[in-house]
């Protein structure tokens, strides 16, 4: 059901990235998402970073409008929706790229996990949106494309070197990164938060199809085994249904 919530707090997290805290706390499983509606603009899905928190990158008209809102302004939300991450025993890797950090942050904070290694990458130091995730993990490994922070390279470079350490790999980020994670792990011991263009968020419109699945209903979190043989990392679909190559 659509309901109005107030923006209780908002602040800059990184370059072109803002956090928005609402005046209502939601019961959710890390990996689930909400649909956020701006009247007269549109409605978009956002993964929850916390019970009352989303973290957003400015990428188009919708997010540009959202960035203009201030504390005390109102937005409309529904959800949470979808399937979230499932906790496993042992040492795990939390792999995030760019703005893929929100569901990974939620998992680090609320997941019933024994030992957590965060492997997080961005283009540059100014684009790292770590929040305070270091308080909820046992180890932090940072990578940047340009070497301005941490290791120069990509999160998947680190994962490839250390994959035998982990009983499970959780990942969210650009789809090409997710495809590489699946390749490195041979589609085993992985849970991936996938993204597709989404309209309804409740499994009716079919716009978020990924192989035989609907991301909003069957995901957004999938196991590697589920994604084997799908188009993950190869192509996605634009709002009008046309195919967009990811290679």
UniProtKB/Swiss-Prot annotation:
Pathway: Pyrimidine metabolism; UMP biosynthesis via de novo pathway; orotate from (S)-dihydroorotate (NAD(+) route): step 1/1. Heterotetramer of 2 PyrK and 2 PyrD type B subunits. PANTHER family: DIHYDROOROTATE DEHYDROGENASE B (NAD(+)), ELECTRON TRANSFER SUBUNIT, DIHYDROOROTATE DEHYDROGENASE B (NAD(+)), ELECTRON TRANSFER SUBUNIT-RELATED. [2Fe-2S] cluster binds at residues 200, 205, 208, 216. GO terms for biological process: 'de novo' UMP biosynthetic process. Keywords: 2Fe-2S, Electron transport, FAD, Flavoprotein, Iron, Iron-sulfur, Metal-binding, Pyrimidine biosynthesis, Transport. Belongs to the PyrK family. Binds 1 [2Fe-2S] cluster per subunit. Binds 1 FAD per subunit. It comes from Pyrococcus abyssi (strain GE5 / Orsay). Its cofactor is [2Fe-2S] cluster; FAD. One of its GO terms (molecular function) is flavin adenine dinucleotide binding. Disulfide bonds: none annotated. This is Probable dihydroorotate dehydrogenase B (NAD(+)), electron transfer subunit.
């Amino acid at each position: 059901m659509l309901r109005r919530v107030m923006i209780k707090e908002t602040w800059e997290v990184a370059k072109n990235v803002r956090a928005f805290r609402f005046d209502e706390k939601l019961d959710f499983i890390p990996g689930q998402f909400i649909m956020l509606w701006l009247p007269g603009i549109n409605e978009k899905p956002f993964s929850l970073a916390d019970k009352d928190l989303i973290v957003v990158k400015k990428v188009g008209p919708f997010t540009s409008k959202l960035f203009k809102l201030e504390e005390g302004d109102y937005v409309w939300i529904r959800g949470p929706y979808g399937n979230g991450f499932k906790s496993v025993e042992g040492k795990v890797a939390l792999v995030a790229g760019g703005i893929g950090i929100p569901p990974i942050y939620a998992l680090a904070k609320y997941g019933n996990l024994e030992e957590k290694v965060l492997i997080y990458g961005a283009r540059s130091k100014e684009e790292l949106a770590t929040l305070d995730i270091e308080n909820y993990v046992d180890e932090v490994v940072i990578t940047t494309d340009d070497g301005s922070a941490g290791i120069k390279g990509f999160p998947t470079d680190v994962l490839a070197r250390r994959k035998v350490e982990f009983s499970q790999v959780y990942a969210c980020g650009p789809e090409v990164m997710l495809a590489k994670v699946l390749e490195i792990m041979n589609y085993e011991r992985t849970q991936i938060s996938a993204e597709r263009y989404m309209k309804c968020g409740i499994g009716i419109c079919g716009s978020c199809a990924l192989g035989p699945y609907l991301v909003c209903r069957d995901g957004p979190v999938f196991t590697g085994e589920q994604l084997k043989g799908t188009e993950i990392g190869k192509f996605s679909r634009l709002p009008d249904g046309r195919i967009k190559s990811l290679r």
